[in-house]
Amino acid sequence: MMNEITERETDYILQHIDSEGDYLYRLYRATNIHLLRGRMASGHLQGRLLKMLVHMIRPKNILEVGTFSGYSAISMAEGLEDGGCLFTYEINDELEPFTRPWIEGSEVADKIVFTIGDAIVEAPKLGITFDMVFLDGDKRTYLEAYEMALGIVRPGGFILADNTLWDGHVLEEARPADRQTLGIEHFNDFVANDPRVERVILPLRDGLTIIRKKG
């Protein structure tokens, strides 16, 4: 049985992994100061993991569903090889005045295409086969986003889904009005039984599911 990581252990981990760098440090701080639910940003540990996964998978094209403040997009773009591109969609247009300057001011701005819009509708129109997809948008539509992603990711490609433990709420029976938790539960149950993929859940922060499309 896994125990929760203590604050001291978290501090130890952060002292023994790569630095997030000054730019991402300032972005994370600004996110928590200026945006509601700032803790939704990936942060140091998850950001370094995402970058490492990009190094391992070596994708040419990445799709991100849910940009928020841009922290995860920048982290993943840092791991892209020359010629690689990350397409990130944010459905909440109120975030654009905060997020766009941070993305465009980063050293990897030339590798990121930031769009305000619904990725479920817009991403398939790109006509691109993706090597990796990161789902981190509206939990109520996770299953729809997953089906969209599965249709445009290559065989052998990867789909990552954030927040799949949802602060432990998935362990309890969700109220009918709690559509966010219900969305995560339906997603988790569906993916667990989907013969088209292999999957594993990491108990990192709020839960990170790594899915590989068979073929």
Describe the residue ranges of each PLM region.
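A short alpha-helical cap/connector motif
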Residues: 1-132, 139-160, 164-215
